[in-house]
Amino acid sequence: MAGQFRSYVWDPLLILSQIVLMQTVYYGSLGLWLALVDGLVHSSPSLDQVFDAEILGFSTPPGRLSTMSFVLNALTCALGLLYFIRRGKQCLDFTVTVHFFHLLGCWLYSSRFPSALTWWLVQAVCIALMAVIGEYLCMRSELKEIPLNSAPKSSV
């Protein structure tokens, strides 16, 4: 297997560190988007915006703004997949893992399983956006030409 290009090696420490890094990117960028939106509409920031499934929705202005923040966060996390994961084949895995841990966080925070249909819809859209755009960016990066220098090293 020495001749295989970019062969996959099982490295649990690398995978765990990438999971932690992507969770950090997810919550860090979501916090920035929510802070930006809250600053624009002069609203007070709250952890409920991140972890309460009842806040996301389309019928109220705060719900629409939170939904918009989650969608923008999916686009930001797609860039995180490009810079930190770098493998198109792993984008869906890391995207689902990030959102699974977010589901657990929401469940623990509110002490009930998220049952709002809009929360599930927003999460499904965000998973699709993050995975597809992240995979597109990673595959575009993987398919770049490898520059080869064909000039001789010396003319001796």
From Swiss-Prot:
One of its GO terms (biological process) is Golgi to plasma membrane protein transport. Involved in protein trafficking. May serve as a receptor for ARFRP1. InterPro entries: Integral_membrane_SYS1 (IPR016973), Integral_membrane_SYS1-rel (IPR019185). Interacts with ARFRP1. The chain crosses the membrane at residues 13-33, 65-85, 91-111, 113-133. This is Protein SYS1 homolog. The gene is SYS1. It comes from the Eukaryota. It is found in: Golgi apparatus membrane. Belongs to the SYS1 family. It is a multi-pass membrane protein. GO terms for cellular component: cytosol; Golgi membrane; trans-Golgi network. It comes from Bos taurus. Keywords: Golgi apparatus, Membrane, Protein transport, Transmembrane, Transmembrane helix, Transport. The lineage of its organism: Eukaryota, Metazoa, Chordata, Craniata, Vertebrata. It holds the Pfam family SYS1. The keyword Transport applies.
